Amino acid sequence: MLSYGATLEVDDHFLALATELVIRWRDDAGLHPDIKIGKINSKDLIKVVVYIVSLHLKHIRFASLAAERYPEIMIPQSLPLWERLEILIQSIAEFSGMNQKLVSDAFDILMLRPSDSEFLKMHTSKFMPLILDMGNAWVLRPVSSVNINPFFSILSLLEYRNTNVRHTISSPREDWLRNDLYALFWGTRYQRVKKNIRLREGNSVLTDIDAAIYDNLTGELALFQIKWQDYFFNDVKKLRSKASNLSKDLDEWSERVTQWVEANGLSKLTRTLGIKDIPEKTTSLYLFGISRNAARMQGYGFRTHAEHLAISNWPQFIRHRCNIGPAPCVFQTLFGVLRNEQDHQLALKPMSIEIVVSSKIMRYEDLWNSIES
């Protein structure tokens, strides 16, 4: 058995670690803090997750220290945490200063309950809830739940309980990613179009532009198509469907924007976007497709074919933007490096593995790939 206490400074230390982790997890999962989930705002749910994770991290660390000092302590027996639900909710409410009813509502959302058993039958991806409701006023706190992003499990549960929640979660993502994109091009050098702009052909909408940035220094104009899809599951059919749709959508968007510009000209495009005080010089146009989590889909058998489009995932785009810095022609350089990576083909070599079980040898052919240098 394991028992310990902690000072306020120690609690604050693990709370700081948990806050840093949860903010990154929240962004990766695409859970905006301003949406409404059930009875509460998601920011309150996120806050409760921070405090639960801090308790998990503290327990893991203290169990590790105890095992080093007292070898007789059994880690597998000490790590699982059983607790009365009412006491845990009260503890977090006191620790956080939140209303106890608010904490209870957050627990109703993030806990895996006995009534969710059907969900486990159909779910094939990693699922590690922060809290397990045993159905008898007791809960289990599996500290292993911090090994992966817990919001993936929470979002999967939410969608199982209410399929309409997917729209609620997805609706703020475009604005969210647009604002993050514009933060990379701040200052007086750039003009940033604040909202989604539709390109019309007569009375019909041909396509739309999710984001646009104009470089006042060089006359370069960059148009962006923004995508934020979830890929935290292993259903191959769903993954291939998302990959196919992403590649098709980006190709169609590039084709329609190019078609509109060829028919109407760059001057009308800049007026449509509301860009002002354009320098008296030739304007260059660059098209970018940014997907928050994944962009190149050749691994699923699909690829984008548009020659005038550079695609990337969000971390890749940030990396190149930071590497390029205040270059003379920022968008030209960005477009070039992204196109080079987009067209780059890796030389892969299949790898096999052998596992010895008793007197038998199991050989898995082509289980992994290695990258040839």
Predicted regions: what is each one?
Residues 1-373:
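Intrinsically disordered, low-complexity Ser/Thr/Pro/Gly-rich regulatory segments
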